Amino acid sequence: MGQKGFYFDQTRCTGCRTCSVACSDLHNYAPDIVLRRVIEFEGGTWKVNTNGTCTQNVFAYYTSIGCNECENPVCVKACPTGAHHKRTEDGLVVIDTEKCIGCGMCAKACPYGSPVLDKAAMKMRKCDGCVARTSKGGMPVCVEACPERALEFGDIE
């Protein structure tokens, strides 16, 4: 097996955040633990014309961010207990919660903000590509939930 990962088609995403909610619901996380973030970028201006009508050039687009399943993940290198590791069978970066001490070193190292602290459990959490599902041939819940099919999961070429 090769490196697994996500493909995001920005042209299809409407910013509905169904992917994010599906992930949180599957794992029963508190509202402050978001492992798949949807970020909105917006800009442009409105102009009132002399005849009282408006002209606009506003825009908005979205990006859905989970874990990038990096080739050389700095979060793994930063983890002092070895709880963060990259699986050899599929390249997914996961956290062994038995080893995790919730120190946050992985979160400080990750340039994408993937690991977050679960304050109730005092453990770090991150998108793991729904490894319990994908290792049995299924798809991550965010991929299945997306109504616009903006997310895909599979081998990275």
Predicted segment positions?
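Non-ligating segments of multi-cofactor redox enzymes
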Residues: 1-157
